[in-house]
């Protein structure tokens, strides 16, 4: 097996990160609004917020070292050069990089003031050798700061074209109502939201977008293509598409605000045994109300047991994870969190007087993360139900969004870790299913006879042990009571 040089791999990741930044249309539009004074003010605000609120803030020496390294690497990055209209020779790049090395060697950084002095020196060097605007250097010091933190912490600018950036947990978005991912030859439509412009225009999951407003996607990055699909409410969008079942076709639609349902599917899986099914795509603000409606719909249809599908669910709001867990747990700890500050430490327990006693199977996979893991661990460790599938992602940290004063945007920082009801640290560990279903990936959102997770869940859903768990969870727990581990 070939061995990858760790240093080479790290340099590749660094270049990929720089390319991602400078091919991101939202970030580029934001940077066009900056001057050096606003950029430096933003650096100070972000630095102070990291110092005060990040769970494990890095030193200014680490941040400066990362910033200078990124700046030197950026000089030879084609996306960076293109975004900043730079025409550089190999000799010019090398001279600049040597000058940055000189700045680094002379740096003695212990404070934000020291870091700002190094940033000022770097601005002079970049202006002299590259003709680079000083605000770009300041932004690289901001990115250098967040790059030294955990992978979930980041600066999130608002899109100056549309206003506050859409959050993954928001219940509506302006656009055409599709979820997409890159694919060979275009952009794959993974999901079409009900009642959105794309749904009304006849788009289907599996369609491939091959041109946008008459422009081919060849040579265009995924983020650039997605940016073109987005746009203000009331604006028109034309798409060229391919569908496996027929010839290429074109559609035109008007962008507007589209509601996003976090509960994406509610149905009876097995009418004979009255096994209900709910799929939750994220833990959003309205998920609790949507879940109530789904449960009552299934209850009125005669549901006797429930399969709750969290596969592919990346998480969302901590408060929503607690609310949903509380619907099924009559007692017991749900989750606890611990951070640097007292305000980041808490423990939440079940407190509802009326809960659903329906026997419960929860599906998870390697892409179930964060709030999904909180819910699954609460159900598992309180012996309320059975977890089926594959080991979850293991995110285990809490992020807080801090609105910024100097610019329109936010700073997302990791402020705490969360722990399971048994006080088990979830970061890096995740949830191991009670029943493991090996070597299976759900390729489509549509359930079918080949879904091994569903097959395993159906075999469990009507077992008397599951009903007993639902009943016993309301009483003092019996040590060691659980359904035996199994493999399917």
Predicted features along the sequence, with ranges:
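Conserved functional hotspot residues or short segments at active or partner-binding sites
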Residues: 93, 410, 424-488
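Acidic, polar loop-rich interaction surfaces within structured domains
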Residues: 369, 384-387, 393-433, 437-439
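Residue-level signature of catalytic and energy-coupling elements of molecular machines
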Residues: 46, 141, 178, 239, ...
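Stable alpha-helical structural segments in soluble proteins, enriched in small hydrophobic residues
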Residues: 67, 144, 148, 198-201, ...
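Short, surface-exposed glycine/acidic/tryptophan-bearing loops
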Residues: 78-94, 163-166, 337-346
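Terminal targeting/pro-maturation regions of precursor/exported proteins
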Residues: 1-153, 480-487
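Cleft-lining beta-strand/loop regions that shape enzyme active-site pockets
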Residues: 55, 60, 128-134, 155-160, ...
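Short loop/turn microsegments at loop-to-beta-strand junctions
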Residues: 176, 188-189, 413-415
